[in-house]
């Protein structure tokens, strides 16, 4: 994943420099909220079936991107994301409840295309944008707040190697700052087993940009 992202950045930077494209470098941080398309299931704990429910909690992301083009632009990037979810397992016999907050750490290579409502060659201090694209994520690790050997905790190996999402939203560029609001729609299953749940997420970013 790291080699792919570095190669992609090198190719895009060489293209932008060679052909005189308007481009900028961006760094950002922000928040996200995850929601699975199928947030209910079952788990086996101590030989007893438990009803499992998963709900999203606020998470965070940090990244960098290179934007090149004029009114129409392309934006490859690299991102580190922290996703938090609460897992509730309810014993189907005793109705006892086990709660666990899982923190999922991922790296991803988002690729977006967009349209600026104002020509940046005329006005580069303020602009409004709409964008769409794809994001490929890989789960690096999973941490649990209430880990127990008695529970079948979800680990990094339980996730598919590449989780693909569609990405679309809007943004504002204001001087050297910018803000993005977006939504990711899961396209591939999150888990390696038979569960076909996909991950959707709302996110917002605020960052700095350097234009060239």
Q: What do the PLM-derived regions correspond to, one by one?
A:
Residues 1-28, 210-212:
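Bacterial Sec-dependent N-terminal signal peptides
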Residues 19-23, 71, 118-127:
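Short loop/turn motifs that connect adjacent beta-strands in outer-membrane beta-barrel proteins
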Residues 19-63:
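Short glycine/proline- and aromatic-enriched beta-strand/turn motifs that initiate or cap beta-hairpins
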Residues 21-23, 56-62, 103-109, 126, ...:
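Residues that define the transmembrane beta-barrel architecture of outer-membrane proteins
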Residues 27-31, 60-70, 78-80, 109-115, ...:
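Residues on the lipid-exposed face of transmembrane beta-strands in outer-membrane beta-barrel proteins
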Residues 35-54, 82-105, 138-160, 189-199:
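Flexible, solvent-exposed loop segments that connect beta-strands
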Residues 77-87, 156-212:
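Predominantly the C-terminal beta-signal and adjacent terminal strand-loop region
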Residues 100-112, 116-119, 127-142:
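Structural signature of Gram-negative outer-membrane beta-barrels, strongest in the C-terminal barrel
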């Amino acid at each position: 994943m790291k080699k792919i992202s570095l190669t992609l950045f090198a190719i895009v930077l060489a293209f932008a420099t060679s052909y005189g494209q308007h481009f900028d470098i961006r760094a950002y941080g922000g928040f996200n909220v995850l929601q699975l398309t199928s947030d209910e299931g079952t788990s086996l704990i101590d030989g007893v079936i438990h009803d499992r429910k998963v709900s999203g909690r606020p998470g965070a992301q940090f990244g960098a991107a290179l934007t090149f083009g004029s009114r129409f632009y392309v934006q490859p990037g690299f991102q580190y994301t922290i996703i938090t979810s609460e897992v509730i397992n309810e014993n189907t016999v005793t109705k006892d409840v086990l709660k666990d907050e899982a923190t999922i750490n991922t790296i991803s290579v988002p690729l977006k295309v967009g349209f600026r409502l104002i020509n940046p060659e005329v006005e580069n201090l303020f602009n409004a944008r709409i964008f769409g694209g794809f994001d490929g994520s890989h789960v690096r690790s999973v941490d649990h707040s209430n880990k127990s050997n008695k529970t079948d905790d979800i680990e990094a190996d339980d996730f598919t190697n590449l989780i693909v999402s569609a990405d679309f939203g809007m943004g504002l560029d204001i001087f050297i700052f910018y803000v993005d609001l977006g939504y990711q729609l899961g396209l591939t299953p999150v888990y390696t087993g038979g569960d076909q749940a996909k991950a959707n997420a709302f996110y917002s970013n605020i960052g700095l940009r350097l234009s060239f």
